[in-house]
């Protein structure tokens, strides 16, 4: 069987020889071969079948390659052409076999073969027929994919067939919509004839001489072959068409002479010169030229020229007569001198070209215009115009010849330059190849010499130690990852017999090496085996990314993967992959290219009117001129590509998606893509750390850094996740490669999974503009075009990485494939969501650099899934400009200019909704109010809404509510509101920006401290809820106007004024800071003025307003979350001082953000928004901004010091000298005072506890909690008879670099003092008896430092429930029910449950009194309840899990969990034992026999839900939906447990009513934040 050399066998013989070899080796482990020695002796050896077949395949491909190169039809010698040639030859062999079958009287088989479908194939002039008999759908699709790949590489055109059934399936009847596949289109056809014709029409450039083997773009051929001959033929026709000459006798005659005739004509000529700024010049402006005066002059015109007497023959006389005949023209195409001016004038008059056209364009115009000279002559004859011998036709021909010669020279010069450039490039390529070959030859020679020397040394060592024992094994030892990949490949692709053969091959290799260690045959055999081994495993590792071959060694190193614990890991150490490095360089280059110049920005929000004209923005700078596409015919179209199929992605494999644009926008001139919207649905289980990296690139650029657009990394959760990627590029649909420009590169990674597993599905859409007119790009417009012209067809995108526009006239291929290599993650994940930065998924237990797994995004390129719009700094009332002075190092100062700039910032904040500080105004300043005006959809000026005059009582307790005003209700009041506020009655959409001005005049030395807070839901009706919200102090000790601005929150930040009575819009609450002024002669009045600022947006609903600012809090409920800077208010406490207070008295403030506001003597605590957030975690890290407000009389003065002691130290035993060594802040005051400063967070373990520890002593109060120490330096001092009582309020107004870690168990929110009995402080916990809890009487204990009213709820002890499926939601009672078959429940899906809503006397929202068996039992221990109830609005994706409580084996555990989402109140909330619930059309899932639980995803809506729901008629809009639960009635099924957990980002906006927790055990108290030292 051995074939020596290249045998001249035909293709059929080669195939037969190969098939015979495989048939002979089938079923054998070894096969004998003959070896011919140098002396002619023949030796027979037994070799493994695997090695024999490898040798056969190598010989087989070598013979086929020789035949392919020798084929005269072969034009391109490369690997892809060889694969296609081999495909066609095999088809030809199949046809030959069919022919032989017919010759051998096997007509039946041939007929069956034809009936199965003989597909025509044409390749280089040959036609083949390929049978599809026995092909399955998988093989047909694979063949189509291979044909499309070949067509893409070679430039073929293929036709896709819409068939749905193969002929071989034998189906005679087809259902509706199915099309049977004809035999000619079962596989895609490749038209070689069209390819050959297009190659002939291409330029005659030598393809083989180019440095690369790609095809050249086709260039139009010049029509220089038949152009001159055509013109000469036309001239010959005109010569032949002359009138026949009349034979006249030749005699000389005299022509009569004629005198010339002249006439005078009066004309007007404009004055072209004028004096401009003292200088004489010629203006170029057409408007100024038309304004210049004209002057008159007399011109002489020659009517008839002088004709002298000429002696000529009679023939000439006849010619002159014919020439003067107006009815007959004769063309004399002789050599005539024609001026260029006359030629241009003639061309313009004929309407053929313009003055500004180039020579090549003029030639194209002449060649495309059907110039009919006879028609022109006839027209002139009809006009009866006398013409000289130099006719117009001759001039036109002369001009045409000159222009053609000029254009031909230009084209020839261009071709010569292009050919020279290609020649130089080819020479440079050859020189580079030669240099690389020389270097490679030197390197290989050096390596050979080193290998020879090493082999010689090793042979000497082996020869010396041959008697000592067997020779060592010097075979190739594969690395760990190579062995793993090879085993996986062998298990999939090899049969058991083949695996056994391969194993025997390696054993025989080792035996032969030991048996004949010193022979050359053994050495060659070992080397050959090592080479084959390396090649085989190189192919197995790189099978997915390299072409299938057995003779090509892998050139790139294997990818780095993580090995299991305890196994050896081979390969290179972890380094940055080439794909990651290229993408990182691309991002850095894109930022540098698109960085705005001085004084301009490419992504600047609008500073002028927000909605100046029908929702269009005008805030572009000059650097964005290339995106300012102006359409000539004003054709504007909002583009949204939605008809895109859903694509599936597999784990660990990068997939590139080219977004087609020509199919829908092929008739548009230009296309501006602003944003790319993607929706990703995860297919993995919740909790698995899996991420998806999505890179968007523009393939029309040469380098990745030029075409890089964005890179986004998403963590895959449950349900659909939507994300918007700003792009901002302009493409041209007429470009032939437009469907391959915009590219999505998607890569999934994370926890190690099996390659090929489906992990996610993706759906994308585009948002932008399409222009039908020809676009133009200009920096400015002419003055004449700006008159009465509105530019309404330009839209500004606020975000986006604007890339320079690129065209592809000279491009051969789009941007090459860029791989994003990665390494799997392990351990817990860490979520990063900074407002102005990036999003990344990092590893918690991995020593390698986590930035190599996924690339961190800069802020200039894109935003992540939860990043907010890059808006300016938030309007925070606690941010002031701080100045330095010698007396006090930290004195707050107010700057009117800075406050005005921050107040006018549009959109507010990305994290905080926005509150601003107050600006002081002089009492003598008279304010001028102008009549406002409205234009379009935005207010141009501030408008006044209403005015209130509030009487201030002379005495008021601390936190007493004085007044509450509903902003929209007061604005819509026809009695008290202003005229302008009545305009809001016809407004459907409103995005308000309120400004409230407070004016209060107090006597000297008096002070009336007031607090103001914005209540979004109107639920802040207790003292603790008002203090825990973001309030502001109004301290008026003299004439001062305080300004308070706020942007109300809502479901979408867009409000409706007509819904003000329903509670949408919020309330303005004014409450007291505690004061007493009994000596006033008359009550004081507080004047409140409400206005709408000019950046308020409103509309009628015809045009949608842009989405407003994002939620003030957004994060994922993971084990660790990085929130960055968060503007969140936490009330720490307040203390009282008076003149008799002890000098040096100390008070401690424990900064435990999760402790809440402790009141009623430690028997109750209120969890606001900040405490609810911190209660979800055990540790926090970062710094915070502390604000201290002193409420004092104007005649009172004093000073305190605030120290920062280290955590874990007993601050009680610090002396004053030791305290002065700590960081401290001095706060003196005279009258009212305020200060804010930043406190750095530090701990000996790097983290602080969010809650106080359970058992602590007086010596170690703070442990790991942050704390403050307040020392009274000077007690409050005042004049005799005055009040010296003051109150100091401590609040945290901002957190910086905040990171939360280690999710906490919610039942351990509070801790007690040592030796006190610990009791579960939470309610609504399911007990086994399922009975109503009994209320207990409470003992009200007033805190001397904080007197608050009693807001208590009943408490009982409870059991701890499991958290296997997330947070506990509710328990639904089952059991027996006479005459009923099913238990049916309807529960509102809301996370804002409160104790007074579903406490001991209510169930759900039906207000039904409880009996002995409680049917529905909600749980307030759910962390979502705690967090979402503290906010005004929330939005989150929820995963509900239903677990059956009962005996599954005895009864059929049938349970249905469904979702009802309809505004029709078809079902009421509560319990029913007779009705039949159905969630058809929505989401539903059922639980059958043998299953223990069922899950249901409830997606979030496009608007936020209210945290507190009071109106049952609006549950559809204020909840996510209604949950339906249905299960069988049986004594074995006691009930069902319902769990819930978030599966995506949690968004919370506004301050709502938090949870108020009370205690009943006398031995248990809560540790307050502020206490007095022992």
Swiss-Prot record:
Capsid proteins form a capsid enclosing the viral positive strand RNA genome. Together they form an icosahedral capsid pseudo T=3 with a diameter of approximately 30 nm (Potential). This is RNA2 polyprotein. SUPFAM superfamilies: Positive stranded ssRNA viruses. GO terms for biological process: transport of virus in host, cell to cell. Transmembrane segments: none annotated. Residues 361-422 form a coiled coil. Keywords: Capsid protein, Coiled coil, Host cell junction, Transport, Viral movement protein, Virion. Residues 557-579, 863-916 are annotated as: Disordered. InterPro entries: Nepo_coat_N (IPR005306), Viral_coat (IPR029053). The record marks 913-914, 1357-1358 as: Cleavage. Specific enzymatic cleavages by RNA1 encoded picornain 3C-like protease in vivo yield mature proteins. It holds the Pfam family Nepo_coat_N. GO terms for cellular component: host cell plasmodesma; viral capsid.
